[in-house]
């Protein structure tokens, strides 16, 4: 197991292009995918470094969390898999017909609208991330009444507000992870809720829960993605997302071209 935390988010997201180029030999675009790009860039850096040592990594969980990026990886020795690391490294190219595509070798024109090189493989481990529910986190990380009483007897100054705040922070730390675990362990489409009006030509973004319910009803998998911004992840093709978004918008919300 390898746990890596990086705090140089300006470099990882590309908001500091010179730092990004110097530290990670990468090029970024600062848009709704900057946080995901930061996670993938760190994953790619660790994966390629490991490959030089005949090691291969399997991401277990990778998140942009406030002012840092956290990744958890399983590291194993395998010369053959380390040699094939190139299949998991590529670029995210912003496109006109879809929000983005992952490609391994963008042409010079596409490179103008691309960020990378970065990890383009699965981001999470389905079973491990799927166990990170709020209930399990509270069970493991939040003190029970007996522990709190022992602490108070030892001088801990903790009132009911402190207990509630602690529980709230524990929940926040794992919120949405279990629900998104399956999708994040395979090919998926990541979308910013705030970008959907522009992408789908509607006047306003639908409510997150309404959109997730509609996508599920249409036969797709969809979940909220844990990020500072409202993001969702789905296995629906983008044209299906557009249809669902337009169908859940009222006629007055439609943009006139």
What annotation goes with each model-predicted range?
Residues 1-257:
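SAM-dependent transferase fold signal centered on methyltransferase-like domains
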């Amino acid at each position: 197991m390898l746990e890596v935390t990086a705090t140089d988010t300006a470099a990882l997201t590309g908001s500091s292009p010179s730092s990004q180029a110097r530290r990670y030999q990468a090029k970024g675009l600062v848009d709704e995918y900057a946080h995901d790009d930061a996670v993938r860039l760190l994953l790619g850096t660790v994966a390629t470094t490991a490959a030089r040592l005949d090691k291969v990594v399997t991401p277990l969980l990778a998140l942009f969390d406030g002012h840092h990026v956290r990744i958890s990886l399983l590291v194993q020795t395998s010369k053959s898999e380390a040699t094939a690391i190139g299949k998991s490294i590529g670029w995210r190219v912003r496109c006109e017909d879809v929000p983005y595509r992952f490609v391994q070798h963008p042409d010079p024109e596409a490179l103008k609208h691309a960020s990378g090189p970065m990890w383009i493989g699965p981001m999470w481990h389905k079973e491990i991330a799927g166990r990170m529910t709020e209930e399990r986190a509270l069970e493991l990380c939040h003190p029970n009444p007996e522990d709190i009483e022992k602490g108070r007897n030892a001088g801990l100054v903790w009132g009911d507000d402190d207990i509630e705040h602690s529980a709230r922070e524990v929940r926040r730390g794992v919120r949405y992870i279990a629900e998104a675990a399956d999708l994040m362990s395979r090919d998926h489409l990541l979308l910013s809720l705030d970008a959907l009006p522009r992408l789908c030509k509607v006047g306003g973004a639908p409510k997150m829960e309404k959109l997730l319910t509609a996508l599920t009803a249409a036969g797709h998998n969809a979940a909220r993605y844990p990020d500072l911004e409202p993001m969702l992840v789905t296995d629906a093709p983008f044209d299906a997302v557009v249809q669902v978004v337009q169908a859940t918008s009222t006629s007055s919300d439609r943009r006139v071209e």
